[in-house]
Amino acid sequence: MKRAIGFTLSLLLLSTIIAQPLQAVDKEPRKILSGWIPYYSVKTVLPLVRKLPSASPNVEGQPSVCDASQYGPVENQAIESSYLFTNKDLMKEVMPFWYSLKSPTVIRDNYVSGNPSWPIADTVCLMRRAGLQVIPTMTDGTAKLVLSEYLANPATRTTIVKTIVDLVMKNNFDGIDLDYEGFAFVDGNATWSKTAPRWVALIKELSVALHAKNKLLSVSTPYVYDPKEKQKGYFVYAWADIASSIDRLRIMTYDYSVARPGPMGPLAWTEKTIKYAISVMSPSKVYVGLPGYGRDWITSVQGKCPISAPPGLIGGAKAATFKMNYAAAKAAIDGAIPTFNEQYSEATYNYTQNYNGLTATGASTACTVNRTVWYQNARSYADRIALVAKYRLGGAAMWTLGMEEIAATNEIRTAALAIAPDPVVNTISLENVTDGFVNYGSLFTVKGLITLKDKTPIAGLNVTLEIKRPNETTWAKIADLVTAADGTVTTPMTLGGAASVRLTTGGTWERAASVSTEEEILVKSLLQVDRPVSALKTLPITIKAQLLPKLAGKTANLQKNVNGKWQNIGTSSISDANGVFTFITSEPKRGVVTMRIQVVDDIASPIFAIVIR
C-alpha cells in the first residue's frame, strides 16, 4: 500500500509540474537561483556557437556584441533553448568558476585554457544577453598557508585587492566571488585564529574598493555555527565580522559526508547554519547551497577481486561522484530502488557488485563489493528552497548549474512562483526632449511613475537614475531619488554626449525589482563662435568656433551670405583635439558681411555680422 500511495503522489506531483506552464500567472517567479559555471562545463549551460562572418569583431577594450543579428537562425535557436536562457526567469546572477589567485599580482585564467576557441567576451556577452549579472568566482591557488601569510602583510594585501579589482574592471564584471577554501581544508584548524583577522581585513579593504566602483562582493564558504557553541564550524571565515562588508554569502551546505557514507547535506544541519548566518547579517545576503551531484562509496569488499575488475575496489576508497540528472539511470543500472530519508531529506540506496575472474597467477577468484549511494533529488531541493521562503533568504546557489534533474528545476520554479513578489510597474518619461534630441548643455527633465500592477502608486520607494553611454555594457548610477505620495519622481538633467537613461528600483521580499524602458537621448552639437565685431578691409580676419561636445576631426566651412544664399569661403577647417575650428579670411570692401559656420552633416552656428572698415 505504501508503494501505491507513493506512486499516486508522484503522479499528482508530475501533473502539477506539467500543468504549471499552462497556468495564467500574473507574477514572475522570484529570482532565487544562482550557481556556478565551471570553465570545463560552460557548454552545459550555453551552446558553443559561432558568430556570422559578418558579425562585429571583438575589439580589445570594447564590449562584445552578441545580439541576435550576430548569429544565424540555428545558432540563435540553440542560444534561446540553452539552460541559462530557459531558466533566466529564476536567476539574476551567475558565478563563472574561472579564476584562481596564484600570487599577489597573478590570477590564473582557467577559462582561456579550457575554451581556447570560444572567446570569453562572447560567453560573458551571452550571459548578459540572458539578463544575468556576472560575478565570477576566484579560488585560492596558492600552497598551504601562503595566502594567509600574504594577507598578514598590509602592503601585500592591498596589492591583492588591486589585482582583483583590476580583473573585475578589465572584464566589466558585476563583482567577484571569493572561494578561498584553502583556509578550511588545507591550512588546518590550528591556524584559523591567526588567519581570521587577516581574512576580515582583506574583505573590508576589498569591499571598499569594489563598492567605490559600484561592484559587488560575494563570498562562498563552508558552514559556520555560533562561536558561543561548542561546535563552531569553519569559524575562520568570521561571518559576523565581514557581514557589513559583503553583498552575498553563499553557504556550501553540502559535502557533509565525504570520507564516509552519509547524506550530502542533512536538512537540519543546513537549517542550523542558515539560522546563524541570518543572526549576523541580512537574510537577503544569504544563499543556501544545493549540490547537483551525489556520491557512491565502497563500504566493504568480500573475497579477492579478479584482475579484470576495475582498480581501486577497496573499502574506504574515495567515493565516486555522479550528476543528479544521472541518478535515476544509475539506480536502474545498479539494480536498486532508492528510498527517501525523511530525516536528512535525501535519497539513498545500497547495492552490490559481483566480479568473477582470475588472479594475477591465473587462479579463479570472485569478490562482492558493497556500495552505498546518497544524493539530493527534486524533493530535497523543494525542502531546501522552503528554507529560502521561511527565512526570506537571497536564494540558493547550485554546484553546478545544469547538473540537476528537470524535476528539481521544476520544484525550484514552483517554489519561486509561490513566493513571487508583487510586480512593480516602472514608467519613465522625458520633458524638453524633442524626437530624442536635446541641445548640448540644455536642461531637460526625467520623470518616473512607480506603481503596482493595479496602478496603485508606491510612495517612499528608492529609485535609481542610471546612465549608459555608447560602447558601454553596464549601467552607472547618477542619482538617487525617492517617490512622492503619488508614486512619481522628477529630476533635472543635462548631457554632454549621447546616452541612454533608465530608472530602476531594488527588490524587496514583498515587491519585485523593476526596470523602466531605456530612453536613448542624442545630443545636438553646439557651436560657440569667437569672432571680431569689426575688421579692416584686406587684412586677415581670424574666426574660431568651439564645437561642443568637443570632437576632433570634424569638418566645417565658413560661409557668407551672398544675395540670400550661403556660399563657402576659403578652405574647410578640421576641428583640433579640443574641438576648435579656426578660419582665416579677409574682405576686400568696406561694409557689413553676414556669416555663419556650417559643420558638415551637422549643425550651423548662429548667424553673425562683421563690420568691415
Predicted regions and their residues:
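Glycan-recognition patch characteristic of GH18 chitinases/ENGases
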Residues: V25-I164
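Glycan-binding loop/region signatures in secreted carbohydrate-active enzymes
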Residues: L46-Q62, G292-L387, T414-I419
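Conserved, mostly hydrophobic/aromatic
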Residues: V94, L178, L206, L249, ...
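Substrate-binding surface in catalytic domains of secreted glycosidases
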Residues: P104-W118, A184-A332
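Beta-strand-rich domain onsets/edges
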Residues: P310-P311, P421-D454, E520-T542, L547-K550
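Glycine-centered loop-to-beta-strand initiation motif
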Residues: G448, K477-M493, S575-I584
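Short flexible loop/turn segments that cap and initiate beta-strands
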Residues: L452-K477, P549-T571
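Enriched for extracellular/lumenal, surface-exposed ectodomains of secreted and cell-surface proteins
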Residues: L495-T517, K589-I607
